[in-house]
């Protein structure tokens, strides 16, 4: 691939919106088309073992890393790079831009905001670099309308708390404040 063949597809939304499911679906299409694919996940996310796994147990093999800088040599051999939980990689924008300019297809799944509805600055930096941005919604777990936000259960205030339905609920605007 040349630098003109590379592009970035960013999939954003709250918890339980299907971001990882969409990432897996898109990567599998490239695998069927015989492209060399690499899937990357954040090392501290140990909820489902070494692969990227959805909340309904769909999975795909992945390389675990604490930093995208550590996978450069592996990424060089891939044509398509899928990155799950992109919000946890501080340098995701520079990594994706560099790889896309080298002709690679990047598919990134990430939260668009924290449980406090504040943006992840690294994802905000990636948006203007992406050719395609897909914003997914979940279902509000209280009123069953569209859920656009992630609400944390409990009183932990740090930003990086990895968990599933035991720690977070997807909520609509109204239910966010309950």
From Swiss-Prot:
Catalytic-site annotation from UniProt: 85 (proton acceptor)
Binding site for Zn(2+): 140, 143, 172, 175
Residues holding ATP: 13-20
Entry GO MF terms: ATP binding; metal ion binding; thymidine kinase activity
UniProt entry keywords in alphabetical sequence: ATP-binding, DNA synthesis, Kinase, Metal-binding, Nucleotide-binding, Transferase, Zinc
One GO-annotated biological process of the protein: thymidine metabolic process
Alphabetized InterPro entries for the sequence: P-loop_NTPase (IPR027417), Thymidine_kinase (IPR001267), Thymidine_kinase_CS (IPR020633)
Residues annotated for substrate binding in this entry: 115, 159-163
Catalytic function, reaction form: thymidine + ATP = dTMP + ADP + H(+)
EC number: 2.7.1.21
Family according to the record: Belongs to the thymidine kinase family.
Stored PANTHER family: THYMIDINE KINASE, THYMIDINE KINASE, CYTOSOLIC
Record-given protein name: Thymidine kinase
Species annotation: Rabbit fibroma virus (strain Kasza)
Gene: TK
């Amino acid at each position: 691939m040349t630098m003109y063949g590379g592009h970035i597809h960013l999939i954003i939304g709250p918890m339980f919106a299907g971001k990882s499911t969409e990432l897996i679906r898109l990567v599998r299409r490239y695998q069927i088309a015989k492209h060399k694919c690499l899937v990357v996940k954040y090392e501290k996310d140990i909820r489902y073992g070494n692969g990227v796994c959805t909340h309904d147990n769909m999975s795909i093999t992945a390389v675990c890393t604490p930093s995208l800088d550590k996978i450069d040599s592996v990424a060089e051999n891939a044509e398509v790079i899928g990155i799950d939980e992109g919000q946890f990689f501080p340098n995701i924008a520079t990594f994706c831009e560099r790889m896309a300019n080298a002709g690679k297809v990047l598919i990134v799944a990430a939260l668009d905001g924290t449980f406090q509805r504040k943006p992840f600055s690294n994802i905000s930096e990636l948006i203007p670099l992406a050719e395609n941005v897909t914003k997914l919604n979940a279902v509000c777990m209280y009123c069953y309308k569209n859920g656009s936000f992630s609400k944390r259960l409990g009183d932990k205030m740090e930003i990086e708390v990895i968990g599933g339905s035991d720690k977070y609920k997807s909520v609509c605007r109204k239910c966010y404040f309950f």
